Amino acid sequence: MYFHQQQLYLNAIGEDIHVADINGKITGTIPTEHSENIKRLEVLGNNIYYTDQINHKVVCCDIEGNKIWEHVDKRIIKNACLTIDNGGNVFVVGYDANVIIMISSDGKQSKVILDASNKINKPTGIHCDRDRKLLLVCNERDGYAGLFDIVN
């Protein structure tokens, strides 16, 4: 579930993304590929970003469900949380690889920006504070939570 511009974006296992108003009334549906595999989603502007943890990818589509890009990386598996910065860069956890991956706003490039040397150990939570340009990363294994500056 994600809240954006007074709308809730909901993903239930095996279903497309549903859009609801703040009272919970479904106002639309956004078709997705492999909806049963969607783990996390986030919205920025008119784009929806979600992880497909079975097929190891992050997908960016518009609010009509038209795919803009997808980025495949074998490190994107279970607990594949993501977050987006103001520039549309995607930050996704590589749970078993103990890394945080940044994917460019066009989906064409990626790089590891945080790893075990930054105390990343089974990361499960990630959030971008777009105003302060900070990335919060939380580990499952040891309970560590760290704040990192986002440098583009």
Roles of regions detected by a PLM:
Residues M1-G14, E33-I54, K74-N89, A97, ...:
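Beta-rich, blade/repeat-based domains predominating
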Residues D16-H18, H56-V58, N98-I101, G143-A145:
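Structural signal for beta-propeller blades
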Residues A20, C61, I84, I103, ...:
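Hydrophobic alpha-helical segments, especially N-terminal targeting/anchoring helices
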Residues D21-K25, D62-N66, S104-K108, V151:
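Short loop/turn segments that connect beta-strands within beta-propeller blades
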Residues K25-E33, N66-V72, Q109-A116:
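A short beta-strand motif characteristic of beta-propeller blades
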Residues G28, N37-K39, T51-W69:
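Histidine/lysine/aspartate-rich catalytic loop segments that bind and position anionic ligands
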Residues F91-V93, I101-M102, K111-I113, G125-H127, ...:
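Conserved active-site loop/cleft motifs that coordinate metal ions or position small ligands
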Residues I120-N152:
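Blade-level signature of beta-propeller repeat domains, shared across WD40, Kelch, NHL, RCC1
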